[in-house]
Every structure is written in C-alpha cells, then in structure tokens.
C-alpha cells in the first residue's frame, strides 16, 4: 500500500510540474496558448544594451516569428537572389547557428510591399519542426527532424493572392492544421504529423483571402478550433473538422488571430477587409449563431494585421497605422487609445504586463487597465516586423537582420 501511495505521489508531482515545463516552450505562432501570453514571471521589464544576452545575424529576409523547444530556436528565411526558402536552427543558449536547411526553391510569388517570402511561423512538437511556404501556386508543407533532416514534404493545396503568403500552421495532438484563404480556393487542411497525409479538409466556398491562424482552446466545455475565413467566423472540432457553430460577417477577409477572454467566456475576432470590426462571440452555441451569440461589436480599435491580446479582462489591440487601444473585453467599451507608431508585430504579455513593439523596433511596456499606464520602454535598434517569443525568462525578438535574446 505504501509502495502504491509513493508511486501515486510521484505521478502527481510529475503532472504538477509538467505544465510548467511545457510552458517554457514557445512552440508555434503566439506561443503555447496561441494568444501571445506567457506564464513566465521572471522577465525583464525595462532593459538596455546590458540586457542583450546575444545578438545573431539572420541571413536573407523574412517576417516569421521564432519558435522555441528546449534548447533550440527555429526560424524561417528567404534568399530572394537564389529563390530559396530556408529553415534555420539556433542554439537558445548562445545564439549559435546550428544548421540551416533549404525547404524549396521556386519562383518568388506576388506579394504586398510590406510582406516577405518567409512570413509563416514554424511549429514544433519537440519531435519535428513543421514549415510552410508558397512555391509557385502551391502551398508546400514540410517536416524536419530536430537535427535538420527532411522527414516529409507535401503539397497541401494551392494559393493565389496579390498580397503574398503568410498563414502559420498550428498543432493539435497528431495533426498539423493550416488555414488557407485564397482566390484559387479557400480551405482548412489538417495533415498527419507523422507522414504529411491528409486527415481532413474543410472547403470554403467563397474563396476569400484569409491569413488568420486557427485558434484552439477549450471553450464552453469542449475543445474548439476557431477559424476566421471566408466571410465568417467558424468553430470546428479539431479532431475531425466537424462544424460546431458559425457567425456570418462582419467582413470578407481576416488577418489577425482570434483571442479568448476567460473571465467573460467570449472569443474575440477582428475582421480586416473591407471593414475592420471586432466581433465578440459566446462560443456555447451550435449551427448559425449570427443573430443569437454575437455579444458585442466594435469598430474602434479593430486591427487589420496585428493580433490583439487579452490580459485580466482588458483587450489590447493596435492598428497597423499605430494607434493602441484598450477595450473592456466583456463589453467592447473603449477605455483609452494612444499613438504607438506604425506596426505589424502582435503584442505579447507576461506577469500582467503587455509588451508592444512598433515597426521601428521600439518597445512599450504597458499595464492594462482603465487608464493608460506605461511601465517602461526599450528599443532593439533596428526595424522589426515579426512578433516575439518568450521562454525561460528571456525575450526573443527578430529584427530586420538579427535575432535578439534579452534577459534581466
């Protein structure tokens, strides 16, 4: 009996510690919870040159965010001169480039002047690293080992847009899921992580552009995958792609990612084009919930590209033009707004603070609340359009030419 009790105690301790260990990884776009938040409480608030642990050169160009697993950082880049798209691996400890592997070589796609050819953030489960690029009119997805060996590469579908490609994949159990909104076909595709074969596919009939990453969270008592695409906001079962609910509108296209407010139980999404509107939806419904579960709508503060963030019941968003807004998440009431500088990067949060970076690499640290409260400021010293990552008390920022590691 004592032996059994001891084993149960050890198991309980392991299960207690495991979430904390997992939280140290930043495995995909916007981190472990997909919303830009970190449980890390040991991060620097204000910093200068003395807080830069290392600064490593990044070859080529790209706007993808770094992802982190254990002692490794993964990043994508493109070499326009040779038309190569590349996966990079750095050592988290000192920023040393451990390896780089070409993913594909293909003609450069059409894109917006502010977009790049390596804008999709990788995803990793600690066994493989998954990347996606546009090659010609094909969406190519590849999986590499942690040591940089190609495991598989598949065509997931086609893509056509004047703005270029930038959809980031997310992981759910043994599936890699990608939202592709394209003029040549709009769809959500789930691939098996082991071999890249298709697990399921959701076709979207309107063929509208979408760049929003799927958001997976337990809401209203069940796991839901919220996808903003094709003139609507929809929730699916990520296991099999079955539709749970949908809310039509408020616009045709979406770029920023959904977020969730635990306090009010609302999932909040902003449309991008032709109208920027926040929708806050109660995710407990089924079928068409357009007229029954949309709790509030708000035009002011709705972002085009940067994803918003929720901290302690406050919704912070920043427009591409550079106006930072704070809304009450449960009601959509705008509490304040403040000029912050034009930006594409999405904010992150930790320890009750929000870290927001504009395109100049200027970082403002804010305590969300009913009035604007700036806690600190910092600067990278170079242009930066990528969203940062957080792991083990350190920030990882991608600038135009370098990857920065910042600590206390």
Whereabouts are the PLM-identified features?
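Noncatalytic, solvent-exposed loop/strand surfaces
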Residues: 23-408
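Bacterial N-terminal signal peptides
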Residues: 9-20
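Generic C-terminal helix-cap and adjacent flexible tail
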Residues: 3-4, 20, 407-408
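Bacterial N-terminal signal peptides that target proteins for export
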Residues: 1-10
């Amino acid at each position: 009996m004592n032996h059994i009790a001891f084993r149960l105690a050890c198991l309980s301790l392991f299960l207690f510690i495991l979430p904390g260990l997992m939280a140290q990884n930043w495995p995909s776009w916007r981190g472990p919870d997909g919303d830009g938040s970190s449980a890390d409480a040991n991060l620097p608030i204000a910093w200068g040159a003395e807080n830069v642990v290392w600064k490593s050169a990044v070859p080529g160009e790209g706007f993808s965010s770094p992802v982190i697993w254990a002692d490794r950082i993964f990043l994508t880049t493109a070499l326009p001169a040779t038309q190569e798209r590349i996966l990079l691996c750095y050592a988290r400890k000192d920023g040393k480039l451990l390896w780089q592997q070409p993913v594909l070589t293909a003609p450069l796609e059409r894109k917006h002047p502010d977009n790049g050819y390596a804008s999709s953030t990788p995803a990793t489960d600690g066994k493989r690293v998954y990347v996606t690029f546009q090659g010609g009119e094909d969406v190519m997805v590849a999986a590499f080992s942690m040591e940089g060996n190609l495991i598989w590469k598949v065509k997931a579908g086609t893509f056509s847009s004047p703005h270029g490609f930038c959809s980031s994949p997310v992981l759910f159990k043994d599936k890699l899921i990608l939202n592709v909104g394209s003029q040549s076909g709009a769809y959500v595709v789930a691939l098996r992580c082991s071999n890249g074969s298709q697990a399921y596919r959701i076709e979207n009939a309107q063929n509208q552009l979408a760049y929003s990453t799927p958001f997976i969270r337990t809401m209203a008592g069940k796991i839901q995958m919220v996808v903003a695409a094709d003139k609507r906001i929809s929730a699916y079962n990520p296991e099999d792609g079955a539709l749970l609910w949908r809310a039509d509108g408020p616009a045709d296209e979406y770029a920023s990612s959904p977020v969730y407010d635990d306090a009010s139980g609302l999932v909040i999404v902003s449309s991008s084009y032709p109208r920027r509107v926040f929708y806050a939806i109660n995710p407990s419904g089924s079928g068409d919930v357009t007229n029954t579960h949309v709790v509030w709508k708000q035009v002011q503060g709705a972002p085009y590209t940067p994803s918003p963030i929720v901290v302690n019941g406050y919704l912070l968003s920043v427009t591409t033009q550079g106006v930072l807004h704070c809304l009450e998440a449960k009601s959509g009431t705008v509490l304040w707004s403040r000029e912050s500088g034009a930006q594409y990067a999405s904010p992150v949060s930790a320890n009750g603070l929000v870290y927001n970076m504009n395109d100049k690499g200027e970082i403002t640290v804010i305590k969300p609340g009913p009035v604007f409260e700036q806690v600190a400021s910092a600067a990278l010293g170079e242009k930066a359009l990528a969203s940062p990552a957080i792991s083990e008390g350190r920030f990882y920022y991608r600038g135009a030419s370098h990857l920065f590691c910042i600590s206390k």
